[in-house]
Amino acid sequence: RSLVVGKPAAQMLIKKNATVTVCHTMTVDMPSVVKEADIVIVAAGRAGVVDDSYVRPGQIIIDVGINVNEEGKLCGDVDYAKVGPIVDAITPVPGGVGSVTTSVLVGHVVEAAEKASK
């Protein structure tokens, strides 16, 4: 439901005629709901909240989360070690979506600077 990831991602996918289900903290039996999806975009804001009970073979998992774990290392919202062997594809954290986000932000900064200089 967040304005940063949840709503924009849902709107983008709906415009492409995807059937979208949005889960949140009040979703009943979330693991069962998530297992039904072919593509799962995770932006929960909690390290490792999505584990192997949420997934099945054939899924693509896009982990947007950026967290610091107990050891001080960056990690996502998905428990990569448990989920990775089950699903068909998963984005890593670090090195996944964050790299794309940085590139897009740099592009926007350059575009804004060019507009400001005119």
Please identify what each model-predicted range represents.
Residues I62-S117:
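Rossmann-fold NAD(P)-binding glycine/threonine-rich loop
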